[in-house]
Amino acid sequence: MTRGSMKRSVLFVETDAAAEYPYANNNLISMYVRCSSLEQARKVFDKMPQRNIVTLFGLSAVFEYVSMGSSLHSQIIKLGSFQMIFFMPLNEIASSVVELTRKCVSITVLKRARQIHALVLTAGAGAATESPYANNNLISMYVRCGSLEQARKVFDKMPHRNVVSYNALYSAYSRNPDFASYAFPLTTHMAFEYVKPNSSTFTSLVQVCAVLEDVLMGSSLNSQIIKLGYSDNVVVQTSVLGMYSSCGDLESARRIFDCVNNRDAVAWNTMIVGSLKNDKIEDGLMFFRNMLMSGVDPTQFTYSIVLNGCSKLGSYSLGKLIHARIIVSDSLADLPLDNALLDMYCSCGDMREAFYVFGRIHNPNLVSWNSIISGCSENGFGEQAMLMYRRLLRMSTPRPDEYTFSAAISATAEPERFVHGKLLHGQVTKLGYERSVFVGTTLLSMYFKNREAESAQKVFDVMKERDVVLWTEMIVGHSRLGNSELAVQFFIEMYREKNRSDGFSLSSVIGACSDMAMLRQGEVFHCLAIRTGFDCVMSVCGALVDMYGKNGKYETAETIFSLASNPDLKCWNSMLGAYSQHGMVEKALSFFEQILENGFMPDAVTYLSLLAACSHRGSTLQGKFLWNQMKEQGIKAGFKHYSCMVNLVSKAGLVDEALELIEQSPPGNNQAELWRTLLSACVNTRNLQIGLYAAEQILKLDPEDTATHILLSNLYAVNGRWEDVAEMRRKIRGLASSKDPGLSWIEVNNNNTQVFSSGDQSNPEVVSQAQDELNRLKRNMLCKSSFNKLVCSN
């Protein structure tokens, strides 16, 4: 305010007519205080014919401009502006303190709250703070400002405490997990001071138990609630419901819920949230149906949590019905509800409807943007994901966070967008998210999918905090690239750093042992799975069955499978694969019947194992029947399915059918393997025409393939074309000089795996260990041969 305008205001207020109104004088005092003219404010105050409590509140504006310890603050005390408090009734003094404290409502005004508290004390209003009413509001003021330590100090200095005093702290502790453990020691003081708890007391204490996940203390409180007659209080019972749900005791929660007479929306919501939190999604949706049948109207929060359940369950039809009900019921959609709808459509793969919902959101927040970007990425719309990410960058707010980058990076994992992923990696580094575990895991997945293990290792090395998800990504990534030995090493290193393994990491490392035929190392991980209780997890069970099956111990695989309580299809497929690998066609087919009897729909893996079994045994008719059955069920055949069928009909000499299958197979470099199988069959059947055509197709893909030249030489030989045989032999000799040596590995000395090649003398220790193992195998063979001779001679 300028000097001129202030003078005009003073001239008006100092008229006799204006002086009769306290309202005018109160505003004049407030104006002088804001302009730091405290002496003028005191003069107006002294001349006031009528003073009320608002006069004091006008002076309280000084706290917005004057800090503790300043000269102006000292001047206030010197002028005695607050001495009027001594001439006010006690109830008005308490009310004035309360009104001042209620102006402090967040942590941003904590300094002002302390100034109010100190100024009231130093101005002589200490008598007011002896009132529990004033002190309780001081406690609430500090709680609202986020200073629970200061609130406790006020509580401890109170000469008289009542139930409201205790409830103020209980409520604060129940909302702050770091302070929740301080609540129960207070109950001893409460009992000592003969303060009787009420419904609010029990509600807050039960919420503390939920925060601490202390179901025993919660049950004890529930007994007191029943004893003191609060079991009919809906608010108290709802808090007990929430406590049991948070602690995972859904049976006790259901018993309490059944005893609640007047169930409101909060009680129903608590049961729905508890079911979803404990992965009982179907039960949560059933509670929602019962809620509707009971006539209780769902709230926006109800719709949001139920839609989240539909997202987790992938229940698209139910999600659509809930969306329709929201529209019909004229419920005013808020941002959390819109985000829940958006997440549901993204999770269920309906991106068209997801974009419609996103477009109707008036002011989408970062959760909205992250949901639409993640939905595009997860549903194969990588280009749209990047477009939405660029749109977000063009906006001033909100700014992308680690979840945004993770979703965008996932969209660039495909080879055609990999270059964008590298650019995003640069942005992540620039903005300081490179050490985020969430972003790091996505970067690892992107690099491994593009076969850049070294780049993935660099990302991993930057991470300071490595959780089990990050380690598992390294294990799975190396396993998929065929680096099974590295996968095992990473698991061992993870375990040494005291990271707890989970079912996914164990199943991945057991799969790596299976690929490398490292049975002894796999048995060690089997023991670890039993010790940690993950042997009951279906992914681990399937990996164990697969490992023992591939290593020739199908009986052990059968034992593990029989111990599984509710094996899933993956576990069934693993056992079926064990029978297939050993050519047990009859057992495989019988096991297939059991799969059908148990209500499972066979998938591509199921039929692959069956076709492989038929291929091993040469069961052509059975294989053709299964092939046609698979196609009738709409299961798309992959390369391995075609490989089994080509091998099967080629062994039977049906080269024309094999040629037809190859031409139907998906194109790619893998087709060379199919053509090579056909070429080998043509050698056996002396079919020169199809054989030459097969060789031509292989050499288009790999002109220097030695195996093809050898097969082609054999084809010429069986057809008597010796000049062509000689020509092929000359080519083979030229190719042999540039051929890369094959590698082998052997497991020796307690799970130590050594890699070597033919004639390799580079590592004497490896040569010695391999030679010792070879000698051991020879001795075993000689002993077995001698035993057989002894048995036969007898």
From Swiss-Prot:
Protein name: Pentatricopeptide repeat-containing protein At3g50420
GO biological process terms on file: RNA modification
Short name of any one Pfam family annotated for the protein: E_motif
Residue windows of the PPR repeats: 131-165, 166-197, 198-232, 233-263, 264-298, 299-333, 334-364, 365-399, 401-435, 436-470, 471-501, 502-536, 537-567, 568-602, 603-637, 638-672
MF terms (GO), sorted A to Z: RNA binding
S-S pairs: none
Segments for region (Type E motif): 674-749
Source organism superkingdom: Eukaryota
Keywords: Repeat
Species this chain originates from: Arabidopsis thaliana (Mouse-ear cress)
Alphabetical list of InterPro entries matching this protein: E_motif, Pentatricopeptide_rpt, PPR_At4g14850-like_plant, TPR-like_helical_dom_sf
Region (Type E(+) motif): 751-782
Recorded family membership: Belongs to the PPR family. PCMP-E subfamily.
